[in-house]
Amino acid sequence: MYTRSKVVGPGLGTSSISRDHAGAGQRRELGLQQNRRQSLEVAAPEGPKMERQGHADQGSAGTYTLIAPNESRRQKIQRIAEQELADLERWKQQNRAKPVYLVPQRLGGSQSEAEVRQKQQLQQMRSKYQQKLKRDESIRIRKEAEEAKFQKMKAIQREKSNKLEEKKQLQEDIRRATFREHHQSKTAELLSRLDTERRNRSACLIAPPATQSSRWKLPVLLRDPSWAGSQAHRDSPQKEDNPRLQKTRDGHQKNKLLETKGQHQEEERAQIHQAEHWRVNNAFLDRLQGKSQPGGLEQSGGCCNMNSTDSWGL
């Protein structure tokens, strides 16, 4: 292996050393100038604006720009900072934790290990019973809430059924009153017509004797056989009028009796229908109540089978 060794002559060595000394001297001079400028800028008092601008131009002549600080603002900021630090120290002194003084007492060792284990076992056994009691209590509260809900539903259904029955009863009363008024008006009209016919016939019966005065004026009418036949024909219905009126009155009484009987039958039918409606509603509410209870399906099963055909067939 061969190594290269740098051979430096006497001329080259002296030139490099002199160059290094010259560069170090130049750097030292530049550093001294910059330090002098900085000391002049810091020590100079606040002058007019042109003087500050001249210093800024002198400072910017180097490699960087130096901005003079605002002394009033700096002092104000320092004063505020010192005041805040003093306030912080004062607050720390005021809110410092106070010493705690406790009465000395004996900690632990009052019970034996067997007693502690027995106590833990009792607490564990009681916890099981307490959980069971809590579960039963929650079930009871849920059942009470469901029962209250079903009772509310039943009350709403009863109120609706009562309103429906009242509405039906009102409509039935209005219909009966209308029918009664119509029947009375028709009966009065029939009776008035019969009375007018009877009066007309009685007037016709009374009118023939007045023809005797006109016998001298109209002798031909008495001798006319057609007039005599018509007079006899008029007299014959008058004789049959009394039995016919009696029959009409009897028929009117029979109609009244039939009407009262029909009203009684209709009232009985309405009462039966209302009782059946109440029975169906009670069966439906009993089924709802049976479903809300735990064993309600088995208890209300027979009732549902007995009432299913009659209740939904309405």
From Swiss-Prot:
Biased composition (Polar residues): 305-314
Domain of life: Eukaryota
Keyword Phosphoprotein: yes
Residue list for modification Phosphoserine: 39
Sequence segments annotated as region (Disordered): 1-72, 227-272, 289-314
Tissue/organ expression: Expressed in the spleen, with expression in T cells, B cells, natural killer cells and natural killer T cells and high expression in monocytes and macrophages.
Coiled coil: 71-180
Name the UniProt record assigns to this protein: Epithelial-stromal interaction protein 1
Species: Mus musculus (Mouse)
Designated gene of the protein: Epsti1
